[in-house]
Amino acid sequence: MNKKQLAIVLWFWLVTAVACGGTAENNTAVAPTAEGAGEVASGVYADGAFKIVATTTQAYDVAQILTEGVPNIEITPLMGAGVDPHLYQPTESDIAAMNEADMVIYSGLFLEGQFDTIFAALREQGVLIHAMSDPVKQGGFTIGGFELSDELVDVDDPHFWFDPRNWELTITDLGEALAEIDPENSQTYAENATAYAAMMTPLYEWANEGLRKVPEGQRHLVTSHDAFQYFGAAFGWQMEAIQGLSTEDEAGVGDIQGTVDFIIAN
């Protein structure tokens, strides 16, 4: 493995640390019904803000971008950069924020593995719970067949955002959801979503052109955690990881030796 390949390995390790680990505030209000569908209130909620909670930095970023220019929205992030969502345990303040929220935006596909029971309870309270991965799953673009535990088998890889085309689906879907919840500001949501989504195809094409310049037999990516299957499928790279799909998986001696053997062989 030459220095250039090593640099690629280190760069992706850093990206994994941040991504598996956000900024436009203020928006208009919607009153959620018992089923979780929103009806626009008289401009704003009684307390003057439509409160959104975003679990991950990705959720926080897209929420801020899509709500830019809409008054009276408060967006609260739960996890900072570098926080691992696989292992993150909601704190008392997190639970309080979600209980007070009108909408919670999360990644889904078991990325936030410790949140499922909380989300179920929030839905019963009428809080809008939006999974960013839903349009990717519904479109048939997830990579599946993984086993997380004895109970969770044949599950999908939750790291869907490493293919920009999947993120475009997320942007469009969330923009439509916000517009439906808050029709008074639907044009702003639509314009923000259209502008942001339009960046994804050029990003994919730029990355695809550059990454495929590496000879096919040398497109190997070694990471500590198996988070790049979507990247590999999108850009024609072979993945090798010490840990499995979730960082809850413990790497054994055999896993480490297998990775060492892979590096030596390639």
Please place each PLM-identified region on the residue numbering.
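Bacterial N-terminal signal peptides that target proteins for export
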Residues: 1-9
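Bacterial N-terminal signal peptides
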Residues: 9-17
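Extracytoplasmic metal-acquisition and chelation regions
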Residues: 20-266
